[in-house]
Amino acid sequence: MKEDVLEQVVDDYLQFKGYFTTHNVRFRPRTDHPEYVSQQDSVASDVDVVAYNPNLSGVQRVVVVSCKSWQTGFDATAKLAELRGTKKNPKRPTWRHFRELWVPRWSEGFRTQIEALTGEPVFSYRIAVTRLKGDATAWPEDPTIKANLPGCSVGFLTLEEMWATMLDELTTTPAASEIGRLAQLLKAAGLTAPTVVAPPAAPPPGSDAAADEEDDG
């Protein structure tokens, strides 16, 4: 079920690119892994979108997307520092948001599940974000990430990039999704802009949205 708006945009974007998509693919470490910890590993995690394009080859054939729809944006430099332990973590440790990238037993279970679903041992892993801040180039070169996703491509998808692609490729044929139809209506009404209109504002302190952002870290 596509509950998150960013996830719906990702879905439409990938379908525009010719991919078949599925959602909320669950994975977890195997119970006989030597580093298995029942208190941490017994409940499955899931990845938001898995996309498959039979007309492509190599890592482009399968795209796996984890959506981080944080209103304050995604600071790639800060998050990687938290994963590395060089920056203080929020209340919920950052590695829990990136188990498949950072924890070998989870990465193994993740890759096994993706291969079982798609038949492909390597793929493109993308983190979809509302807005990207910091240095994103360090992520695919990080030794831990490279070791945990060998042969895979790692990078980011921004909402701006996906939305611009959708607006550019939309025709007058009614779109199949609500997000696609909304994009068509906004485009038809002339309510789209080629550049960023306003910078994002953080949620008001003490609001539910602010609490969610703090917990997501």
Which sequence ranges carry the predicted segments?
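Intrinsically disordered, low-complexity Ser/Thr/Pro/Gly-rich regulatory segments
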Residues: M1-G217
